[in-house]
Regions:
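Bacterial N-terminal signal peptides that target proteins for export
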Residues: 1-11
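Bacterial N-terminal signal peptides
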Residues: 10-22
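Intrinsic disorder/low-complexity segments
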Residues: 1-3, 19, 71
Length: 204
């Protein structure tokens, strides 16, 4: 009986130690996703509805190989400006990602085939408190320009920043923006960032 109990306790101790042993061995939380990205001409082969593209939620990322951050966005616009295909995003003053946008010449916007949990986490946690991508087990990749994006995405647009300007409340011409910031403006007014789409990637 004593031998049997000893073996039982030894088995339990071994099972409890496995997570720690895995971390010490450097085992990643998740395996790298399969599939590769292929570039495509956004002016010729982009069929998504621009009026619902942002409403369903995207991830916005900025930074470099040293440090980066991402956040969930649902405001944005797509179109043509100064003869270039452009994406416009809006980021509130107190968002951590804004610090990276303000010092980066490029940013990316991404969609995920199954990204509800990713978008939810990225939207409810701040990168000031820790590495959100690492917490989610996301695998960070970089474009030739050093712009971050995630291997788990299914569509990536890399944008070169052309213009940035904060909203001016004195310029509001209707109660829609006034009421929004009166009720939900704790993070401050938004800054508008317009970027030229310089690279579009689709997961194969």
């Amino acid at each position: 009986m004593k031998v049997s109990r000893f073996l039982h306790l030894l088995l339990v101790a071994t099972l409890l130690a496995l997570p720690t042993l895995s971390m010490l061995a450097g085992t990643p939380k998740t395996a790298a996703p399969t599939g590769t990205f292929k570039a495509f001409p956004v002016n010729e082969d982009f069929t998504l509805n621009p009026f619902t593209y942002f409403r369903e939620g995207l991830l916005l990322a900025a930074g470099d190989r040293e440090k980066s951050n991402a956040m969930t966005i649902s405001w944005g616009a797509m179109g043509t400006l100064w003869g270039r295909p452009t994406v416009t995003v809006y980021v509130a003053e107190r968002r951590y990602t804004k610090e990276f946008l303000d010092r980066s010449p490029y940013f990316t916007v991404m969609t995920f085939a199954e990204g509800d949990s990713i978008l939810r986490y990225m939207g409810h946690h701040s990168g000031r408190d820790g590495d959100k991508a690492a917490a989610l087990g996301l695998h960070t990749l970089y474009t030739d320009n050093g712009t971050p994006y995630y291997a788990e995405a299914d569509l990536v647009l890399e944008c070169r920043l052309l213009y940035a300007a904060p909203f001016d409340s004195a310029a509001f011409k209707d109660d829609v923006p006034r009421e929004h910031y009166a009720k939900r403006g704790k993070a401050g007014l938004h800054t508008m960032y317009i970027g030229e789409v310089v690279r579009a990637l689709r997961k194969e």
